[in-house]
C-alpha cells in the first residue's frame, strides 16, 4: 500500500482503501510463515541490515518457532482435523493482524500525522527528537478506559514514544501533562477523540493517497478539535 506521500503511486493503489483492510489480516500469518525466516536468512529487516543471531540467540529463535508451531498447529491436530486447525489458525492470526495493524496505523498513518523528509544526507531529520514524535504520532480514544486496557495503553502512542520506560497505566495522567505543555509552547498535540474517528481518518488517508493526483495536505484539521 501507499501509506506515505513520499512513496511512489502505483495503479493498484487506487483501491487500497478497500483491499488493505483484508491484507492487514495477512500480516501476522506472513510473519509466522515467511517474514521471520526471510529476515534471518538475508540478515535484513526491510532494507536495513542487522547482525544475525548466533549461538544461544539463534537457539532461542529456533526453539521459539518450534514451540509456537507445536502449540498453534501440532497440539490442535491431535484432536481436530487438518481443515479445522488451519481454519481457526487463519482466523485467529487474521484477527490479530487486523488489530495490530489498526493500532499502529491509527497512530501514524492518518491525515493529521506529518511525514517529514530527511535532510540532504538522507539520514537525519532536522526536527528535534521530541517535536518529531509529536508531529508524527497521533493518540486516539484517550478517554476509553476499556480500550486502553485491551490494547495495553497503545492508544496513547504519543506518550509511548516520549516515555517508553513509563508503565502504560500512567499514560492517561502523563498525556494531560504533555498536552498542557504542548499548548504552553505552541506545539500541536495530535489526537482523535474516539476510536471510530481514528479509523475514519485512516480510511480517508488511504483513499486520498491512492488517487491519481494526491493533493491532500499533511494536516487537514485542527488536532485539538478533531473528534
PLM region spans:
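Non-catalytic, topology-defining segments of multipass membrane proteins
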Residues: 1-138, 142-151, 169-227
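Active-site/pore-lining binding-face segments in mid-to-C-terminal subdomains
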Residues: 154-155
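Solvent-exposed interhelical
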Residues: 163
Amino acid at each position: 500500500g501507499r501509506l506515505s506521500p513520499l512513496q511512489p503511486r502505483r495503479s493498484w493503489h487506487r483501491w487500497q482503501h478497500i483491499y488493505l483492510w483484508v491484507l492487514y489480516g495477512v500480516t501476522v500469518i506472513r510473519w509466522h510463515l515467511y517474514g521471520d525466516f526471510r529476515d534471518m536468512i538475508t540478515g535484513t529487516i526491510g532494507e536495513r541490515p542487522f547482525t544475525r543471531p548466533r549461538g544461544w540467540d539463534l537457539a532461542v529463535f529456533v526453539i521459539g518457532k518450534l514451540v509456537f508451531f507445536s502449540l498453534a498447529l501440532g497440539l490442535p491436530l491431535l484432536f481436530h482435523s487438518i481443515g479445522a486447525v488451519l481454519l481457526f489458525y487463519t482466523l485467529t492470526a487474521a484477527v490479530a493482524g487486523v488489530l495490530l495493524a489498526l493500532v499502529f496505523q491509527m497512530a501514524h498513518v492518518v491525515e493529521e500525522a506529518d511525514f517529514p523528509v530527511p535532510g540532504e544526507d538522507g539520514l537525519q531529520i532536522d526536527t528535534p527528537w521530541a517535536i518529531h514524535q509529536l508531529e508524527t504520532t497521533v493518540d486516539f480514544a484517550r478517554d476509553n478506559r476499556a480500550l486502553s486496557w485491551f490494547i495495553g495503553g497503545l492508544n496513547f502512542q504519543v506518550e509511548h514514544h516520549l516515555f517508553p520506560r513509563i508503565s502504560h497505566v500512567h499514560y492517561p495522567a502523563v498525556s494531560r501533562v504533555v498536552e498542557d505543555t504542548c499548548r504552553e509552547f505552541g506545539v500541536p498535540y495530535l489526537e482523535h477523540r474516539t476510536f471510530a474517528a481514528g479509523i475514519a481518518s485512516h480510511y480517508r488517508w488511504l483513499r486520498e493517497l491512492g488517487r491519481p493526483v494526491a493533493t491532500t495536505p499533511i494536516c487537514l484539521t485542527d488536532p485539538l478539535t478533531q473528534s
